[in-house]
């Protein structure tokens, strides 16, 4: 079977999958990748198999799209370019996802909570943090609960 025939008959599978996963931002890129994969799958499909071509394509394309999502999640680095730069000749700044989340968290916290979180992330125990901050252990526990509550409220 020629690929044009396969494409004309089964192109709706690609649109369905992209709609199923609410892909709107990089629609064309995902469409192109799925189209290439559809061509590859049409080359290896055996009509003598028990599975129809449409179910074969749907299953394989669905799993391929999921694999693409997983690959994208493994790319944790984000490039942030300066807004005031008219050209992209400047060196971009790299932040990983954890740094960006920490920045968001730090914006929510007051000074004491930020200091507690910084010390906690550096590996200090609660009693050590209490000594460094010159606060009681019960106050440190209250700060910890406050940070936890703010994070859960804003990020869950």
From Swiss-Prot:
<keyword id="KW-0804">Transcription</keyword>
<dbReference type="GO" id="GO:0016987">
    <property type="term" value="F:sigma factor activity"/>
</dbReference>
<dbReference type="InterPro" id="IPR007627">
    <property type="entry name" value="RNA_pol_sigma70_r2"/>
</dbReference>
<feature type="short sequence motif" description="Polymerase core binding">
    <location>
        <begin position="29"/>
        <end position="44"/>
    </location>
</feature>
<feature type="DNA-binding region" description="H-T-H motif">
    <location>
        <begin position="126"/>
        <end position="145"/>
    </location>
</feature>
<dbReference type="InterPro" id="IPR036388">
    <property type="entry name" value="WH-like_DNA-bd_sf"/>
</dbReference>
<comment type="similarity">
    <text>Belongs to the sigma-70 factor family.</text>
</comment>
<protein>
    <recommendedName>
        <fullName>RNA polymerase sigma factor SigS</fullName>
    </recommendedName>
</protein>
<keyword id="KW-0805">Transcription regulation</keyword>
<dbReference type="InterPro" id="IPR013325">
    <property type="entry name" value="RNA_pol_sigma_r2"/>
</dbReference>
<comment type="function">
    <text>Sigma factors are initiation factors that promote the attachment of RNA polymerase to specific initiation sites and are then released. Sigma-S contributes to the protection against external stress, thus playing a role in cellular fitness and survival.</text>
</comment>
<dbReference type="InterPro" id="IPR014284">
    <property type="entry name" value="RNA_pol_sigma-70_dom"/>
</dbReference>
<dbReference type="InterPro" id="IPR016032">
    <property type="entry name" value="Sig_transdc_resp-reg_C-effctor"/>
</dbReference>
<keyword id="KW-0731">Sigma factor</keyword>
<dbReference type="GO" id="GO:0006352">
    <property type="term" value="P:DNA-templated transcription initiation"/>
</dbReference>
<dbReference type="GO" id="GO:0003677">
    <property type="term" value="F:DNA binding"/>
</dbReference>
<keyword id="KW-0238">DNA-binding</keyword>
<dbReference type="Pfam" id="PF04542">
    <property type="entry name" value="Sigma70_r2"/>
</dbReference>
């Amino acid at each position: 079977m020629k690929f044009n025939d396969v494409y004309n008959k089964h192109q709706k599978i690609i649109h369905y999958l992209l709609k199923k996963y609410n892909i709107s931002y990089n629609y064309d890129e995902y469409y192109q990748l799925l189209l290439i994969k559809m061509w590859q799958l049409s080359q290896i499909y055996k009509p003598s198999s028990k599975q129809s071509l449409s179910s074969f394509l749907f299953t394989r394309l669905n799993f391929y799209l999921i694999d693409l999502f997983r690959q994208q999640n493994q790319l944790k680095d984000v490039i942030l370019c300066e807004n005031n730069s008219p050209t992209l000749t400047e060196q971009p700044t790299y932040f990983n996802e954890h740094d960006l989340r920490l920045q968001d968290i730090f914006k929510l916290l007051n000074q004491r909570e930020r200091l507690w979180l910084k010390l906690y992330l550096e590996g200090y125990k609660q009693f050590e943090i209490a000594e460094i901050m010159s606060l009681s252990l019960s106050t440190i526990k209250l700060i910890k609960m406050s940070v936890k509550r703010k994070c859960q409220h804003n990020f869950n």
